[in-house]
Amino acid sequence: MKETTTIVRVKPTSDLNTPYVAFTVCPNFHSAYKKDTLRNVYNISVDDYRYKSNWYPTKDINPDNAKEFFHNITYGLYDVIHKLEISTMSLTTPKVQIAPKEEGSIEYATFFTQYTDTYGRCYTMVAKDAILALGITKVTIIARMGVYVFLDHPGQHLHSNSRSKV
């Protein structure tokens, strides 16, 4: 897969009371689903899944195998995001690199999975106080595939009145 880089510059502040935007990274529309897995394992196409209501390949659907099916046909966090580079105002820590872990909370950021029909699994990065206190000046997202990056108000993932796509 080809890596894609997205850079977002923000007005820096080290005020922890100011809410910081959440970055939601989604596979682009054409990359949202694993076409080979749908075709070779489940014998359906992306169009069958998206547009013809062939949601699941079995009649015995339950919440556990529905989630397993969705995870099998969409991309995990590490498949989508290679790393984030965050530049700060700090003289001692001018740049921080974050290599995400599945659903893991790391020192400077937490990643949450967002489930969508349009983009498959998306991943929202919420900066922690440790990095916010350094004053973020730039966020560079290096993706493993074509992605959309949404800037959301915290807690309002993909709401049409509270997001921007970069």
List each language-model region with its residue ranges.
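Non-transmembrane functional regions of membrane and envelope proteins
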Residues: 1-166
